[in-house]
């Protein structure tokens, strides 16, 4: 039983290690607005564990952004490098941004509500930008909480299933042991009864035959033969219902036994 428990414990540890490796080094999901991502709900999986956001036109600072998985980029030599572009005011802006978490390149309404890059200024635009940033923060927090619960469920369900399997195996082993012990006890009792009945029957037969031979010998010349034996034999016959071949008689005194 201890050996089976140790094997099951080692198996559970290996399963937990495998799940931890899959969760830490597995693929991540990225927000993708390309045409081929429409069928997958505007999401893609990155084997490089990296998402990107970049300008459609690097020469135009007001160009809209595109998002996707880093695996879909044709050129991988300058991946995730701080590529810079200059706008009309002379300030530098990044043309490619990379991140390495689930849906990290999803900015919600930020791309729509944010002012044009570079020349946009003014207090109203700053307020609008701050409001969109707060909305993005709330959306990201909600997404991260859902991801956390999903990962917790992915870890907890196999562990719970493994524990239930271990309990069922232990219960089955216990039931089999108790059933085996009960069958062994019944078999031992049956063998003991057969042994005692066989030997007891033969010993009683031997005692009755010995009593018959002893009572055939006369004790005296003028008294009944073996009155004590007669009483003992009658008691044995009443209990065991065994008939003897010897009939009782009277000793005549002439030296012979007369049968009745």
UniProtKB/Swiss-Prot annotation:
Signal peptide coordinates: 1-20
Topology versus the membrane: Single-pass type I membrane protein
Gene3D superfamilies: CD59
UniProt entry keywords in alphabetical sequence: Glycoprotein, Membrane, Signal, Transmembrane, Transmembrane helix
GO cellular component terms listed in the entry, alphabetical order: cytoplasm; plasma membrane
Compartments reported by the entry: Membrane
Side Cytoplasmic, residues: 174-260
A GO molecular-function descriptor: type II transforming growth factor beta receptor binding
Transmembrane segments: 153-173
Positions annotated as glycosylated: 87
Any single GO BP term: cell migration
Pfam families linked to this entry: BAMBI (PF06211), BAMBI_C (PF19337)
Tissue-by-tissue expression: High expression in kidney medulla, placenta and spleen; low in kidney cortex, liver, prostate and gut. Not expressed in normal skin, expression is high in melanocytes and in 3 out of 11 melanoma metastases tested.
Main location, first listed in the record: membrane
Superkingdom of this protein's organism: Eukaryota
Role description: Negatively regulates TGF-beta signaling.
Family in the record: Belongs to the BAMBI family.
Protein name: BMP and activin membrane-bound inhibitor homolog
Gene name per UniProt: BAMBI
